[in-house]
Every structure is written in C-alpha cells, then in structure tokens.
Amino acid sequence: MYKLLRSILFLFPTESVHYFSMNCLKILCSVPLIRALISWIFIPNNKKLSKKQVGLNFKNPIGLGAGFDKNARYLRELESLGFGFVEIGTVTPLPQAGNDQPRLFRLPKDKALVNRMGFNNDGVKVIAERLRQWSIKNGHSEDGHSRLTSHVPRFIIGGNIGKNKITPNEEAWKDYEICFKELHPYVDYFVVNVSSPNTPGLRELQEKESLRKILMHLEMINNGKAHSKPILLKIAPDLTREQIDDVVDLA
C-alpha cells in the first residue's frame, strides 16, 4: 500500500504533496474518534520516555524541527502522531512568499529532500494569533501561560525566528526582537535562526558582533519577563573552529 501511494504522490510537485498530505490528516483528526484512534496508535505510553531539558518537561525526546509546520497550522495533528515537541517557523515579522517555485526537490535514491524554501510564512502577527487560539483550547491562560504544573511532561512548542529578506543585516536585530515579543507568551522555547543558506546574507549574522547585538536584545527582553524562555541558537554546520569558539563565548 505504501509503495502504491508513494508512486502516486510522486507524480505531483513535492510542495503540493506536503500540503495535501497534511490537510488530509487535518480532516481525519477533525473527527474525534479517528483522532483518538491515531493518538492511540502513535503516542507512546511510556513515562520513561519523558525528558527534562533546558528547564522543560518533554513527553518524549522525538520532535519535529522547523520547516515542516511553518505557520502553526497542524499542531493538533502532529501531537496526535506522537511527537514530543514541534518547532514552528521560521517566522518573520512580515509575511513573505519565500523563493520561487519549485523550491523543494526529491532525492529518491537518498530518501531525502532538498529545501530551498526561503522563510515562506504568514508573518508573526497571524502565527501568534494562531498560537494564542491553540493555547486557549489546550488549557492555557489567555496570556499563554500553562495551567499545567511545571513538572508535568507535556507537548512542547518551539518558535524558530528569523529576519525578512528585505531587512538589511544592520537592522536584523529588530526583526528578531519583533518576533520574540510577539511569540513569547505562546511558545516554550526559541530558536534564533542565523544559518539558513536560502536567505541572502543571513549567514553573515553569525559573525561575532552581529550575533552579539541580536542575542543581547533578546536576553534583555527575556530577563524582563515574568516567565523567561530558553533561547537556542541555530548555526551553520560548516563554521570554522574559530567561529564556533566565538559563538560559544557569546553563549
């Protein structure tokens, strides 16, 4: 059955198949009985899998990184599939279309995809409102703070933030600050994305002084909140040893 479905889906553009598949899952999960069945099949019932990292209690250590659910549209469905956490984004202050299509390519022999999306997303205002609605539906207060006690393992949501393509690097810190403020009540942790090769000039923000400015502003905001959030940094895999040392010094 899988091989048959795969061969049919491979007849269509990769990005279209992604959204088609997730929308089908969304329809299925809108039926309570079907969603309960999916959850029963996929959500592991093993307390030994719960983990505490960066001050957060995860149901299990298997999560989904940013890029799959950029706009926080499929949180209920991904939780039903058993993920312990999902990272939404990358989110930018303004909506942007991303790079021209096609921008997602299959490598069948490697069972992999090449991603050249370019931070396409609905913009932080729309995504923050979506997360606010999710928070209310899932037992959180109006401002996003969980009603669950902090020691109870739960489904964790991360927010991956970046800058708009039109924003000059000298002002990039403002974009990260806007996203941080808007998403802060509704996500459990942040990822500062300065590593994507699909946004021109973004990797230049990994340079020490540029990165210092971004992180300094975010830390100031975070420290002023009643509930601070962990801040993680996403860097490129090909940094030099000296560049890595600079990043570690800033952290």
Regions from the language model: what does each represent?
Residues F58, A66-F68, E79, N120-S135, ...:
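Conserved alpha/beta-domain cores
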Residues P13, A97-Q101, R203-E204:
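Short secondary-structure transition/capping segments
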Residues G89-S135:
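A gly/proline- and charged-residue-enriched helix-loop-helix capping module
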Residues G55-K59, G63, G67-D69, R73-P93:
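Active-site cofactor/substrate anionic-group-binding motifs, chiefly glycine-
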Residues Y74-L78, Q96-R103, N169-A172:
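Short, conserved acidic/polar surface loops in the N-terminal third of protein domains
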